[in-house]
Amino acid sequence: MKILVSNDDGYQAQGIIELAQSLAQEHEVIVVAPSENKSAASSSLTLDKPLRPIQISNNVYCIDATPSDCVHLALCGFLNEEIDLVVTGINFGANLGDDVIYSGTVAGAIEGRFLGLPSLSISLASWRGQHFKTAGIVIRQLINQISHAHLSYGTVLNINVPDVIFSDIKGFQTTRLGKRHMSEQSVIDKNDSSLYWIGENGKEADNGVGTDFHAITNHYVSITPLQTDLTKYNEINTVSTWLNQIITT
């Protein structure tokens, strides 16, 4: 297959280098990634200026842009290639539970799905970042399986891999997203009290059996099918009822 690879940590990050090298053993890989770290960029697109792809080497490009920009331009712009699959990562750090709303890595995969391609995002679920090779093996195995399967249109697979050697992986689990508590308070900059840093993620709130949190804690690879339809269907009638009351009073 011909695979487009991107991320949100930047084209020089260890994770994307490991991902590209791992996939290149069996597939043709084209890397189009941000020129620098764009973590937590979510699905933002750059609309206020033009973007310039820069070729770094054969089949490796960087852009001063978000992950979604990179995937969008690669599929709708400068690449004259027929891409079969989009894979984003390997992210440095987990994308579990509510993280997926903010993640540029997940957003890059979602952009690929918006543009009609099967897409996967993969993250190494630790800030130690010691076992990217494990994640590389995992994604290669999954792609070999997916090539014989069918993902319904609009589905993105969000994959999180424990930061352990491959022989310590207990297996694969299909999971749902867990939930976090509210984020921690913003932090005042040590050198300038007029500046603030965004606070850390909230602690795990829903991490029971069946969640992505639970799988990772127990050394399983977590695979969560995602969709982009954010409609809360069971609230439609409730909202309609009080809207009707507003209209009639």
Swiss-Prot record:
Residues binding a divalent metal cation, per UniProt: 8-9, 39, 91
GO molecular function: 3'-nucleotidase activity; 5'-nucleotidase activity; exopolyphosphatase activity; metal ion binding; nucleotide binding
Superkingdom of the organism of origin: Bacteria
Catalysed reaction, written as an equation: a ribonucleoside 5'-phosphate + H2O = a ribonucleoside + phosphate
Cofactor: a divalent metal cation
InterPro entries (alphabetical): SurE, SurE-like_Pase/nucleotidase, SurE-like_sf
Enzyme Commission code(s) on record: 3.1.3.5
Classification via SUPFAM superfamilies: SurE-like
Family matches, as Gene3D superfamilies: Survival protein SurE-like phosphatase/nucleotidase
Any Gene Ontology CC annotation: cytoplasm
Family as reported in the entry's similarity comment: Belongs to the SurE nucleotidase family.
Function: Nucleotidase that shows phosphatase activity on nucleoside 5'-monophosphates.
Protein name: 5'-nucleotidase SurE
